[in-house]
C-alpha cells in the first residue's frame, strides 16, 4: 500500500499522473513535464514534498550529538533559522543520506529524504543513545516548495509576513500569529531558482496549495523537479552518492567541515585517509548537443585515459535544448569524453557539474 501525502486528492483532481516514488503515491507531472519545468524557470511553480522526512532533535546534548553525527558542523549555525547542507556518513565515509539541518529556537530540525527514511531514523536513533537528546519525527507536518523567479512574491502576496522580506538564502523563520502555529518557511530549494520551502501542519496544506494555484503558481510534479535539480547540478541520493560513495567523490567536499581539527565526526578517519591518498574518481557534468539523450548507467570513456566512468543522472535539458548528465569518472578525465550508447559513441564535453542557475546557462 503506497503512502499518500495530505495533498493526494488534490493531485488526482488536478490531473496529476501518480507514480510510486520511494513508497509514496506522488505526481510525476500534471500533463506536461516540460511546461512545468519552464514555469519554474520563468515564473513560479509548486511541488508537494510532504514525502520528505522532518525530524526534530532536542535536548541538552543536541549540539554535541549533531557535531558527531554530521560531516558539516552545526556550530556554523549562529542564528535560529540558519540552514546547513550536509552529508550524514557511515564509518567508511560513505553517504547514508544528504540533508538540510536548521538551527531552531529549541533545538535543531533535519529534513531528510523519503526513500532513506527507515535507514536514516534507525541510524540517528542508534547514534543518539550516547547523548542526552530526544529524536522526534514530525509526520503531522506537510511541506510545499514554491520555486522560481516570481515565487517569493507569490508567497508574500498570500502570507504577507514582513519577516519573509528580510529572509536570506539558506535561512528559515517560524511564522507567528493566528493560523500560523507550526509554520516554518525557509528560503531553500532543489531547483536552482529562488523560492521557499514551507513546512506546515498537514491540515493547512490543502488550503495553501489551492490558494497558490488560484494566484497563478503552477502545480509541478517530480519529473520537472528532477530535470530542474539536474540542470542546477544538484545531487540525488542513490545516484550521485550512496553508502559506498564518499562526499569527496560526489562533489560534496565543501560540505565537510575539517576545522576545528579536534571535532570528531562519523566517517572522519576514513575521509582523512581518502583525502591523503587522493580520490580515484570525481563527479563531472557532461554536455551532448547532438541527437539523443544521455541516461543513467551509460559508460563513459576518455581517449588515452585508463578506466571507465558511468553516468549517474542524465536527461534532456528543457532550458538548454540538449542533453546533459552528471557522471562519476576517473580523475584523469579532462574536457572531452565518449559515452557508449548501444553501438554508438557520443562525443561529449566535460564541465564542472552545474549547467543552469537562476534560469541562465553557467558554463
From Swiss-Prot:
Q: According to the UniProt entry, what is the EC number of this protein? A: 2.1.2.10
Presence of the UniProt keyword Transferase in the record: yes
Q: Does the keyword Transferase apply?
A: yes
Alphabetical list of InterPro entries matching this protein: GCS_T (IPR006223), GCS_T_bac (IPR022903), GCST_C (IPR013977), GCV_T_N (IPR006222), GcvT/YgfZ/DmdA (IPR028896), GcvT/YgfZ_C (IPR029043), TrmE/GcvT_dom1 (IPR027266)
Catalysed reactions listed for this entry: N(6)-[(R)-S(8)-aminomethyldihydrolipoyl]-L-lysyl-[protein] + (6S)-5,6,7,8-tetrahydrofolate = N(6)-[(R)-dihydrolipoyl]-L-lysyl-[protein] + (6R)-5,10-methylene-5,6,7,8-tetrahydrofolate + NH4(+)
One GO biological process this protein is involved in is: glycine decarboxylation via glycine cleavage system
Q: Which UniProt keywords apply?
A: Aminotransferase, Transferase
Q: Which GO terms describe its cellular component?
A: cytosol; glycine cleavage complex
Q: Which domain of life is it from?
A: Bacteria
Gene Ontology terms for molecular function: aminomethyltransferase activity; transaminase activity
Hey, which family's this protein in?
Belongs to the GcvT family.
Subunit and interaction comment = The glycine cleavage system is composed of four proteins: P, T, L and H.
Q: Which HAMAP family match?
A: GcvT (MF_00259)
Q: Its function?
A: The glycine cleavage system catalyzes the degradation of glycine.
Q: What is this protein called?
A: Aminomethyltransferase
Origin organism is Teredinibacter turnerae (strain ATCC 39867 / T7901)
Its lineage reads: Bacteria, Pseudomonadati, Pseudomonadota, Gammaproteobacteria, Cellvibrionales
Query: Which gene is the coding source of this polypeptide chain?
Result: gcvT
Amino acid at each position: 500500500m503506497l503512502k499518500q501525502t495530505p495533498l493526494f486528492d488534490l493531485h488526482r483532481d488536478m490531473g496529476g499522473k501518480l507514480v510510486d516514488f520511494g513508497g509514496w503515491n506522488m505526481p510525476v507531472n500534471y500533463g506536461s513535464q516540460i511546461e512545468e519545468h519552464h514555469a519554474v524557470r520563468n515564473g513560479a511553480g509548486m511541488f508537494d514534498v510532504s514525502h520528505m522526512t522532518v525530524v526534530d532533535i532536542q535536548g541538552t546534548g543536541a549540539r554535541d550529538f549533531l557535531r558527531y553525527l554530521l560531516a558539516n558542523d552545526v556550530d556554523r549555525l549562529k542564528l535560529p533559522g540558519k540552514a546547513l547542507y550536509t552529508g550524514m556518513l557511515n564509518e567508511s565515509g560513505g553517504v547514508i543520506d544528504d540533508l538540510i539541518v536548521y538551527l531552531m529556537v529549541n533545538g535543531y530540525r533535519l529534513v531528510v529524504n523519503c526513500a532513506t527514511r527507515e535507514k536514516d531514523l534507525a541510524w540517528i536513533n542508534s547514534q543518539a543513545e550516547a547523548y542526552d537528546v530526544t529524536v522526534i519525527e514530525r509526520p503531522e507536518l506537510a511541506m510545499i516548495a514554491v520555486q522560481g523567479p516570481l515565487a517569493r512574491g507569490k508567497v508574500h502576496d498570500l502570507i504577507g509576513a514582513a519577516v519573509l522580506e528580510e529572509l536570506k538564502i539558506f535561512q528559515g523563520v517560524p511564522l507567528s500569529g493566528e493560523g500560523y502555529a507550526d509554520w516554518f518557511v525557509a528560503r531553500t530549494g532543489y531547483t536552482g531558482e529562488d523560492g521557499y520551502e514551507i513546512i506546515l501542519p498537514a491540515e493547512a496544506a490543502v488550503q495553501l496549495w489551492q490558494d497558490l494555484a488560484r494566484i497563478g503558481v503552477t502545480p509541478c510534479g517530480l519529473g520537472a523537479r528532477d530535470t530542474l535539480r539536474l540542470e542546477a547540478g544538484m545531487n540525488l541520493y542513490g545516484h550521485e552518492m550512496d553508502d559506498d560513495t564518499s562526499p569527496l567523490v560526489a562533489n560534496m567536499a565543501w560540505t565537510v567541515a575539517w576545522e576545528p581539527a579536534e571535532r570528531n565526526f562519523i566517517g572522519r578517519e576514513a575521509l582523512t585517509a581518502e583525502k591523503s591518498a587522493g580520490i580515484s574518481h570525481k563527479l563531472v557534468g557532461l554536455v551532448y548537443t547532438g541527437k539523443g539523450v544521455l541516461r543513467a548507467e551509460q559508460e563513459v570513456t576518455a581517449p588515452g585515459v585508463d578506466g571507465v566512468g558511468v553516468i549517474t543522472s542524465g536527461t534532456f535539458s528543457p532550458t538548454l535544448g540538449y542533453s546533459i548528465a552528471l557522471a562519476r569518472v576517473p580523475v584523469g578525465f579532462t574536457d572531452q569524453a565518449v559515452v557508449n550508447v548501444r553501438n554508438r559513441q557520443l562525443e561529449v564535453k566535460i564541465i564542472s557539474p552545474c549547467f543552469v542557475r537562476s534560469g541562465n546557462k553557467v558554463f
